Amino acid sequence: MSQMDRTMQFNFPEDDQRANTRETLITVYQALEEKGYQPINQIVGYLLSGDPAYIPRHNDARNLIRKIERDELLEELVKSYLNDRRED
């Protein structure tokens, strides 16, 4: 079979995307802590409502989190949670 007959596959760089999402969540969490907020409550508020006012501008957290779709953030959180549960 020649190279021309083979089906090429394209895979998104999922590891890079996951790492970026994870780094963003950690940065946002730290910014919320530094400002004296309850990070989990604020992130949940943002995820449920889509209102960026739940996230402070401190350390550019608001702009960072808005660059990632909320469904991608939820996907990463669920994957991380389930992976941790499997290891228990």
Curated annotation (Swiss-Prot):
Pfam families with a match to the protein in the record: IreB (PF06135)
Domain of life, source organism: Bacteria
Transmembrane segments: none
InterPro entries membership: IreB
Family of the protein in this entry: Belongs to the UPF0297 family.
Record-given protein name: UPF0297 protein EAT1b_2723
Natural source organism: Exiguobacterium sp. (strain ATCC BAA-1283 / AT1b)
